[in-house]
Amino acid sequence: MSGHSKFANIKHKKEKNDAKKGKIFTVIGREIVMAVKAGGPDPANNSKLRDVIAKAKANNMPNDTIDRGIKKAAGADSADSYEKAVYEGYGPNGVAIIVETLTDNKNRTAGNVRNAFTKGNGSIGTQGCVSFMFDQKGQIIIDKEELEDECGEMDADELMMTALDAGAEDFSEEEDSFEIITAPDDFSAVREALEKAGIPLVEAQIAMIPQTYVELTDDQAIKDLHRTLDLLD
């Protein structure tokens, strides 16, 4: 899910509660199923599966859970089947929102998404109504404290050069993290180069990145947006 508001854009949060983590694991589990069914269970021959495994590890999913998910998806009797469905709409004050889902029931999911927009005083729109405001990019987040713990003296310049040499498009520094942006086709190569260098990744995913951001100052609009995002999560 991508938000047109700066604070609504998904960023690293050091502490995730158990319910949030459970939802993330469920989504990643479905992504594992789709990746295995599309390209097989061997990560060495399935770049999409490698990307999903990296995402799982960045979210602290246990290795045995990852392995079980791959084996289950590869089983001949596996009945799990998910489809990707994308919804677009507007939150309060015209904030553009894209919702990406993996579902085994599109009708149910469409109703749930529509309900989330409505309860947050927003509205679901037609396909393409906001997607032109976003660019699909590879997004990698690195926590400064974790980088120092794992890589010692590596500074921002060295990290930036490692990323750019591997094919990254952009590198930016926040207060407590670094963000690396890649073209979708270069994402796997950049991620693998960073992992090979021993750099810990907090987030590694293909995401819809807003071209511009809006700032919400109205308290009610902020509450409505939080309500929408909470329901969508």
Model segments located where?
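N-terminal cationic and glycine-rich segments that engage phosphates or anionic surfaces
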Residues: 1-125, 129-143
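Positively charged, low-complexity, intrinsically disordered RNA-binding extensions
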Residues: 141-233
